């Protein structure tokens, strides 16, 4: 190497920044032969060795620098980076914090601290550290990009999108930033923009596995399943041990109804990352969907580990399936109304076994549950809780009962309904609905308000026109929410009427919904609360369920009946978001239903 007049430490740092790591190490080692106590030079050597992947040597150099100069922030920074790289994340965090105590303006240390906090699961701390870094050095594009990813993890999609956009403005040739922007667009629901951003990332770097995986996610939401699968497979060719990419492949396979392949992908994802809660949960749901109950129920406990999960409402002694007479058991609802209804089907098993059961439930269901289960105590859920844990021997969330009492399809009872509507209201509704002399009264519900999968479960009322023309039927609105505009459009454009009872709030008055369902001869509905209510009442109910995306596991796969609700028939969509064939099948079946009455 030609002579350079600069100090060896400065020359070594410059060579490191240029990526000439071997030369940097050579310069620094030669200089340290003459100045073995130069802590800054040792720290710089640790940095170069770390970037080379020589972690043990880097650790030794950083530790020696700290022994000589405990107040040298860069040495603590390099030690922290090595510790994180060697899997000692918590120690790395401590070292980064020490570096920042010594130099609060050390932007790179704030950035690395953010990454380490993210690895440890402290997303809020990660975001805070990245924000400190970009306040100190606003031009750090990689930190803006990482901040965007952390904000996405925290569910702050708008802020994440802004941070990722700023990253690509600062560094238009930074492929990873474009990939993160693509992911942010995907989470924001802008899938075409997501595809464009990921394609830009891949124009800059075809070897970027994350961009391929993000592209696969966006393509999947556009319905391009084959292209999505190919993108995910390319990501895994580049990074075979990438748990997130393996999980994303599983999602695409599940969407394509390749359930065995999806199970294999989820299993591989959790082998690679044992703490990957979403992969464990999807594995659980696919196993349950296929009837593999023992393993599926056991893995269903991972729902508490998902980031979006609410904390357990009660956490004292858990019930573990003992059917001991007199045992005082507190049951509590943990999910939505439909889930509380479906899992309430298991309560009878507990009562018959002699357990003393108290059920804490959504207030809208409390009266209905008291009438339906007179041998248990029903408490309306409130905050703070209206029950005293000391009054019970154990507790269980409703969805946790299946693990112990529904181990196989044979364990599901062939009941005739377990909920009982208010008889007086049923009689009143029946009188109102039948005075016009129709052969059959059929309740319909066509939409789901679920934020994540509602669009996949929903139809438009206008799509039902052929069904609504079946003669001899009075159709009744069982759809919660404001349906006035949909019904008026149907009347004006198709000349069709759906009877609406304005005095029943189908969202809040679930007693009214139950009575109205009970007053019908048949209920036809998409997967929502109405489906659960009708099935739990034992009414004939025909369910429209999505092909894959939006299909909840408890409708199972390749079945046209329901293990949970014996009175239910299931019409499964064959092509995503195309309900035409299924609604036509319902039209034909309804014609036969009316003819036989």
Model regions and ranges:
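Alpha-helical solenoid repeat scaffolds of the TPR/TPR-like class and their adjacent stem/linker regions
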Residues: 1-597
């Amino acid at each position: 190497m030609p002579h350079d007049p600069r100090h060896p430490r400065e020359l070594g740092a410059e060579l490191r920044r240029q990526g000439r790591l071997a030369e940097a190490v050579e310069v620094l080692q030669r200089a340290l032969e003459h100045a073995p106590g130069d802590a800054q030079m040792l720290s710089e050597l640790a940095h170069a060795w770390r970037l080379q992947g020589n972690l043990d040597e880097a650790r030794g150099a950083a530790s020696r620098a700290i022994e000589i100069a405990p107040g040298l922030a860069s040495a603590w920074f390099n030690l922290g980076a090595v510790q994180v790289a060697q899997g000692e994340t918590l120690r790395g965090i401590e070292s980064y914090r020490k570096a920042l105590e010594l130099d609060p303006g050390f932007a790179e240390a704030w950035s690395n601290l953010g990454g380490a906090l993210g690895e440890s699961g402290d997303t809020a701390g990660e975001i805070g550290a990245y924000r400190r870094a970009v306040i100190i050095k606003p031009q750090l594009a990689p930190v803006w990009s990482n901040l965007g990813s952390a904000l996405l993890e925290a569910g702050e999609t708008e802020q994440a999108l802004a941070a990722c956009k700023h990253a690509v403005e600062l560094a238009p040739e930074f492929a990873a930033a474009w990939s993160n922007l693509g992911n942010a667009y995907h989470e924001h629901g802008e899938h075409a923009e997501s595809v464009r951003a990921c394609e830009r990332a891949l124009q800059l770097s075809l070897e970027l596995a994350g961009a391929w995986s993000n592209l696969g996610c966006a393509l999947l939401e556009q319905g391009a399943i084959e292209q999505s699968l190919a993108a995910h497979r390319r990501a895994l060719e580049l990074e075979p041990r990438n748990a997130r990419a393996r999980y994303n492949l599983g999602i695409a396979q599940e969407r394509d109804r390749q359930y065995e392949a999806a199970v294999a992908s989820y299993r591989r994802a959790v082998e690679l990352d044992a703490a990957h809660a979403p992969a464990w949960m999807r594995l659980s749901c696919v196993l349950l969907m296929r009837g593999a109950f023992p393993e599926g129920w056991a893995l269903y406990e991972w729902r508490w580990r998902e980031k979006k999960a609410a904390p357990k409402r009660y956490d004292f002694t858990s019930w573990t399936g003992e059917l001991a007479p007199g045992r005082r058991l507190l049951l509590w609802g943990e999910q939505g109304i439909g889930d509380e209804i479906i899992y309430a089907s298991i309560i009878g098993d507990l009562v018959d076994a002699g357990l003393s059961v108290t059920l804490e439930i959504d207030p809208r269901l409390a009266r209905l549950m008291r009438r339906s289960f007179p041998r248990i105590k029903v408490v309306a859920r409130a905050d703070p809780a209206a029950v005293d844990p000391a009054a019970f021997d154990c507790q269980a969330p409703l969805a946790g009962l299946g693990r112990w009492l529904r181990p196989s399809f044979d364990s599901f009872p062939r009941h005739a309904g377990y909920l009982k509507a208010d008889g007086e209201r049923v009689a009143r509704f029946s009188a109102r609905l039948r005075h016009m002399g129709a052969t059959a009264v059929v309740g319909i519900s066509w939409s789901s308000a679920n934020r994540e999968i509602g669009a996949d479960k929903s139809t438009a009322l206008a799509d039902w026109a052929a069904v609504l023309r079946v003669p001899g039927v009075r159709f009744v609105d069982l759809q919660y929410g404001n349906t006035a505009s949909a019904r008026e459009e149907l009347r004006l454009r198709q000349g069709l009427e759906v009877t609406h009872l304005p005095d029943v709030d189908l969202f809040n008055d679930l007693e009214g919904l139950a009575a109205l369902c009970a007053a019908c001869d048949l209920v036809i509905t998409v997967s929502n609360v109405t489906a659960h209510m009708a099935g739990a009442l034992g009414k004939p109910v025909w369910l429209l369920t999505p092909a894959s995306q939006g299909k909840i596991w408890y409708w199972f796969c390749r079945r046209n009946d329901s293990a949970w609700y014996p009175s239910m028939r299931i019409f499964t969509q064959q092509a995503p978001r195309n309900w035409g064939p299924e609604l036509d099948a319902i039209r034909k079946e309804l014609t036969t239903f009316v003819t036989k009455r």
